[in-house]
A protein has these predicted regions:
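Surface-exposed patches in mature extracellular/periplasmic domains of secreted proteins
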Residues: 46-60, 73-85, 120-137
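A short alpha-helix/helix-coil micro-patch that ends at or immediately precedes a cysteine
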Residues: 21-71
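C-terminal edge beta-strand
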Residues: 4-15
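Ser/Thr/Gly/Pro-rich low-complexity, disordered linker/stalk segments of secreted
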Residues: 16-26, 158-159
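Short, surface-exposed glycine/acidic/tryptophan-bearing loops
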Residues: 60-105
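Disulfide-stabilized extracellular recognition modules
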Residues: 101-159
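Extracytoplasmic/secreted envelope proteins and their assembly/folding machinery
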Residues: 33-41, 59, 63-66, 92, ...
C-alpha cells in the first residue's frame, strides 16, 4: 500500500442574516447526515463517478470529529479517529462550517460549499474512493460538517 498526501481548503460562510439556529434533535442530525450522503452521491453520478457506500466506521469517525467542533483540518486527529473507528485504510476529508442556516438546509449548504471549492470538490468525486462517512455538530456557534471518503488503496499511518 502507498500513502497519499493532500491539501484541502476549509470553506466558512455565513448563512441568512437574522435566522436562528434551531435546536437539532438526533433524528434531524441523522437525517441531515443521510441527505449529505445522497447529495454527494448525486454529485458523483453527475460527474460519471460510482456512488459511495456508507461505511459505519467512517460515519462514527466523522461524527466524532464533528463533535470535537474543530473547524479546520487536523490530520493527526482525523487519522486517529478513523483508525480508532476500525477503518483500516486511507481517506480523504472535507470540513465546512457555517452559521445561521436552518437545520433543514444543513445538508444542501454543506455539499454546495464543497462543490464550490476545487479541493473539496475533488475529494467528493475522487474515483479511488468507495465508501463515505458524514458527521454533523450544531451548537450556538454554528454547524460543522465532516465528510470522510474511504480509499481502500491508500494508507492511514495511524491504522
Amino acid at each position: 500500500q502507498h500513502g497519499q498526501t493532500a491539501t484541502l481548503t476549509l470553506t466558512v460562510v455565513d448563512g441568512k442574516q437574522g435566522a436562528s439556529i434551531p435546536e437539532s434533535s438526533m433524528s434531524q442530525t441523522d437525517a441531515a447526515r443521510q441527505e449529505i450522503v445522497r447529495l454527494v452521491n448525486q454529485v458523483r453520478r453527475e460527474n460519471g463517478v460510482p456512488e459511495l457506500t456508507v461505511n459505519a466506521a467512517l460515519m462514527d469517525a466523522a461524527q466524532h470529529c464533528a463533535s470535537l467542533r474543530v473547524a479546520y483540518h487536523q490530520n493527526k486527529v482525523e487519522c486517529e479517529a478513523v483508525a480508532a473507528s476500525g477503518y483500516p485504510h486511507g481517506f480523504g476529508s472535507n470540513i465546512t462550517a457555517f452559521a445561521n442556516v436552518p437545520a433543514s438546509e444543513t445538508a444542501g449548504r454543506a455539499v454546495e460549499n464543497w462543490r464550490n471549492s476545487p479541493g473539496h470538490f475533488q475529494t467528493m468525486i475522487n474515483p479511488d474512493c468507495d465508501t463515505i462517512g458524514v458527521g454533523i455538530s450544531t451548537d450556538e456557534g454554528g454547524t460543522i460538517c465532516f465528510l470522510f471518503v474511504g480509499d481502500p488503496n491508500a494508507h492511514n499511518p495511524y491504522a
